[in-house]
Amino acid sequence: MRVFGVDPGLTRCGFGVVDVAANRSASLVAVGVIGSSSELPLSQRLLVISESIDQWLDTHSPDVLAVERVFSQTNLSTVMGVAQASGIVIAAAAKRGIAVALHTPSEVKAAVTGNGRADKIAVTAMVTRILKLKVAPTPADAADALALAITHAWRSGPGSTAAAGELTPARKLWLEAEAKARKNVEKSSKQRR
């Protein structure tokens, strides 16, 4: 399965393409970061991302696109930029009939490092190890894009192109475990009162 991971952003958008075999071994196909100057108008910055994603999708023909899910951040302008970049990327995949999956940062960290609170250094180290790279991918946006691709392949299973709205067996188990953990936390909070 070929998975294209995208760590969206206006200033830096990380792209990473990996091939993952049925035995979960992963190999690097391509990695890069697309940048746009903050001095450009928003429309031009989004155009840079649009043209770049079009070129990467046409060159690498992924089975599925894995994008970091926009999560809560305190900086509203950062969230807006990430959401706008995500929209451009998702629309480009949709035009080509490529399935899109969204993964939260904690899901990616947990899948790649075993710890949902791992720092960027740990994620980069594990991506380097998983892909058997001699040099770590830089900057962090590139490593994050590769981590997204690996996460999707590992969570969805061999040959699956399940998109965001389709729950894979692994995703169902994850959601059930999260719900159970939340109930346990709520229950223990009530008992303390």
Curated annotation (Swiss-Prot):
Its cofactor is Mg(2+). Binds 2 Mg(2+) ion per subunit. It is found in: Cytoplasm. PROSITE patterns: RUVC (PS01321). Keywords: Cytoplasm, DNA damage, DNA recombination, DNA repair, DNA-binding, Endonuclease, Hydrolase, Magnesium, Metal-binding, Nuclease. The keyword Nuclease applies. SUPFAM superfamilies: Ribonuclease H-like. Mg(2+) 1 binds at D7, D141. The keyword Thylakoid does not apply. It is an enzyme of class 3 (hydrolase). The active site is at D7, E68, D141. Its main location: cytoplasm. Mg(2+) 2 binds at E68. Disulfide bonds: none annotated. GO terms for molecular function: crossover junction DNA endonuclease activity; DNA binding; magnesium ion binding. Signal peptide: none annotated. GO terms for biological process: DNA recombination; DNA repair. Gene3D superfamilies: Ribonuclease H-like superfamily/Ribonuclease H (3.30.420.10). InterPro entries: RNaseH-like_sf (IPR012337), RNaseH_sf (IPR036397), X-over_junc_endoDNase_Mg_BS (IPR020563), X-over_junc_endoDNase_RuvC (IPR002176). GO terms for cellular component: cytoplasm; Holliday junction resolvase complex. Belongs to the RuvC family. Homodimer which binds Holliday junction (HJ) DNA. The HJ becomes 2-fold symmetrical on binding to RuvC with unstacked arms; it has a different conformation from HJ DNA in complex with RuvA. In the full resolvosome a probable DNA-RuvA(4)-RuvB(12)-RuvC(2) complex forms which resolves the HJ. This is Crossover junction endodeoxyribonuclease RuvC. It comes from Renibacterium salmoninarum (strain ATCC 33209 / DSM 20767 / JCM 11484 / NBRC 15589 / NCIMB 2235).
